Amino acid sequence: MKRLKRFLLGVFALCAVFVVFGWDYDLKTVCYTVDSPKITQPVRILCLSDLHSCRYGEGQKDLLDAVTAAAPDLVVLVGDIYDDVLPPGNTDTTLAALAQNWPCYYVTGNHDVFCGDAAAAHGVTALNGDALPLTVNDQDLLLCGLSDPRESPAFAKHLAALNEQAQTAEAFTVLLSHRPSRIGQYLPGGWDLILSGHAHGGQWRIPGLLNGLLAPDEGLFPRYAGGRYDLENTTFIVSRGLAKESTRVPRLYNPPELVLVEIQ
């Protein structure tokens, strides 16, 4: 009996240590490099996802300092930056500061479907089926974005038109769309880069063993919970997002993140 008690106590202690070390809410910046013959000078794109109006220090200082440290050429926001429950103040502060310092582009997610105008009021460019030719560091990009299908009944029509444009574009093509589960609909465009969010990293992770336990749309053991996926000729990157206090399920071994993509 004593041996069993010691064993159970040992198991409990190990589980407690495992959880404590995994309970990490320190903001990380995760970097990816994408090589392309279309690009001769590096272009740095910083991607924010799923902020859900969460707080990052006084005046969002922790988040804004991390963005500054990443030294992006442009900032993209791939949905659920606002929340449909938490008040908008933290997001308003974030967007206003970002737009003062970098070109910013925004697509809606399922929790901020009606917030495109609110983002635009801060100087952020909201994309709803739009294709924008950009020149960044003398490099030609075609930046495209889709509103969340919950908001946009024209989602399928917009996506078909954008896929057609991407197929013939000579510029480096980038698609912003909130939901990673729809990757099968995006791939016919032959995009060079697709950026999504929504999955919150699958909430619980075990690095090296489990990339995510549960995600919206995909359910248990989601295929596209977070990270980089090289699919055909497309680099698909899913941000694990920035949500903290807004989540019903705590994050485990899944710290909030910014995604920095350097195209070269």
Named regions from a protein language model:
Residues 10-90:
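N-terminal active-site segment of His-dependent metallophosphoesterases
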Residues 27, 35-46, 124, 131-145, ...:
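Beta-strand-turn-beta hairpins that frame and shape the catalytic cleft
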Residues 21, 45-61, 81-89, 114, ...:
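Acidic/histidine-rich helix-loop elements
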Residues 1-13:
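N-terminal Sec-pathway targeting helices
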Residues 116, 121-123, 128-130, 136-177, ...:
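Binuclear metal-dependent hydrolase catalytic cores centered on His/Asp/Glu-rich metal-binding motifs
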Residues 59-135:
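Core catalytic region of metal-dependent phosphoesterases/phosphodiesterases
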Residues 47-49, 74-80, 104-110, 127-129, ...:
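Active-site neighborhood of phospho(di)ester-bond hydrolases with catalytic His/Asp-centered motifs
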Residues 180-259:
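Conserved beta-sheet core of the metallophosphoesterase superfamily
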